[in-house]
Amino acid sequence: DKSDKTELSNFEINPASAVNGTIYYNGTQDNHYLYAMNTATDGVSTVWDGNLWYPIVQGDYVYYMDVENDYRLCRYSLSRNEIEVLTNERIDCFNVGYGYVYYQVNGEEACLKCMRDDGSDSWVIAEGNYTAINMTSQYVYFQMFGDDSSWYHSPLGSQSYSVFDAARQAALDALKK
């Protein structure tokens, strides 16, 4: 009967990041501002009136795709109210953690790249279009766009990658059932 459920929003939100009981997301209706929802009170506040997509909060920084500037990758300092451009390349997706940012460059020379979380030392991990970038403390995992059956992984901060056979084998075993 849904009597124990509370509607938090009457429109779709992208809960891109959650930290200490706060969900951060960008606007999808009238603007692309950064919003925060306190999960204890269900209260929503505007954090920053930027034009951003897919915000990820790490410490004092909000990493995001800059909608106004062709989806380049930036970070915003919450305490200093300052924007830093990490790359001017147009990106499709990214993830950040453990001192690194992994991101998919869009365009004719599409590739998966890595940089330090301050924007320094970028390098190519793999040529082509990749998505579903996930990180652990030791590895980054990703898939080639359009191929849901294969996963790849790379030791965090390295320049090499390989097929993650355990994921492929689990998928094949599931198909046999």
Segments and roles (model prediction):
Residues 1, 19, 30, 58, ...:
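Short loop/turn segments that connect beta-strands within the blades of beta-propeller domains
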